[in-house]
Amino acid sequence: MSQSDXRSGXKAREEALEQWVEERKKKRIAEKELRRINKKIKKLEDENPWLGNVVGMLRKKKDEEGGPPAKRARREDMEIDSTPGRKSKARGFTDQERRDHRRRKALENKKKQLAGGGKNLSXEEEEELRRLARDDDERERRVAGPRPGGVNPMXGPPRGAPGGGFVPSLQGVPESPFSRTGEGIDIRGTQQFPWYGFTPPPPGYYWVPGCTQQ
């Protein structure tokens, strides 16, 4: 290979290297701009829940045009679960409180990921995480008690069971004779038949309701 061929080959490599470096620089700038745009879009959607409906309509239109199926838009309103024994955890929370809770979970996940690499959150993020955790605990205590009104009166102690349940009074409801230990069926050998206003027969006589005494 002649010296001119070697120079032309080196020049071509230099040009290719310069183009590669320039394109990678453009790529980094574009990725940084894309991340900034995505964060701004996310913030707008969090502050304006109604935008989720617009996103859903756009995705539905795209699906009708033959595009790939997209994920469902996140619902900001409370999901109703009809399963017995379960209650919604979103009871009494505002949109801002839900955003704070999601921010706390995101910071906790970030802290775990950084801890895996031997790193820590910044001092500002640590302080924010402590504040959000403290606010979350206060909210949990706020909604854990029984609701005012309804079963529980507005003033005075609650009438229901701890946690807001209601134990109704059994006044006027006939009791089962098999569970009574007062004047009822002689289940312990210390009582007699409940006469309820009838005069008991003399000792040695037994009377059964519906039958004629002998």
Curated annotation (Swiss-Prot):
Location in or out of the cell: Virion; Host nucleus, Host nucleolus
GO biological process annotation, one example: viral penetration into host nucleus
Positions of post-translational N6-acetyllysine modification: K71
Modified residues (Phosphoserine): S2, S122, S176
Keywords of this entry: Acetylation, Host nucleus, Lipoprotein, Methylation, Phosphoprotein, Prenylation, RNA-binding, Viral penetration into host nucleus, Virion, Virus entry into host cell
Lipid anchor positions (S-farnesyl cysteine): C211
UniProt modified residues of type Omega-N-methylated arginine: R13
Stretches the record annotates as RNAPII-binding: 129-194
Domain of life of the organism encoding this protein: Viruses
Modified residues (Cysteine methyl ester): C211
Residues of the HDAg domain: 20-194
Processing and modification events after translation: Prenylated by host farnesyl-transferase in the cytoplasm prior to nucleus translocation. Phosphorylated at serines by host CK2 and other kinases. phosphorylation does not seem to be important for its function.
Region of interest (RNA-binding), residue spans: 96-106, 135-145
Residue segments, region Disordered: 43-185
GO cellular component: host cell; host cell nucleolus; virion component
Biased composition (Basic and acidic residues): 128-143
GO molecular function: RNA binding
UniProt similarity note: Belongs to the hepatitis delta antigen family.
Assembly notes: Homodimer. Homooctamer. Interacts with HBV HBsAg. May interact with clathrin to induce virion budding.
Miscellaneous comment text of the record: This strain belongs to the genotype III found only among cases in South America and which causes a more severe form of infection than genotypes I and II.
Known role: Following virus entry into host cell, provides nuclear import of HDV RNPs thanks to its nuclear localization signal. Needs co-infection with hepatitis B virus to provide surface proteins, otherwise there is no packaging or budding. Packages the HDV ribonucleoprotein in hepatitis B virus empty particles. Interacts with both HDV genomic RNA and cytoplasmic tail of HBsAg. May inhibit viral RNA replication.
The protein's name: Large delta antigen
Organism (species): Hepatitis delta virus genotype III (isolate VnzD8349)
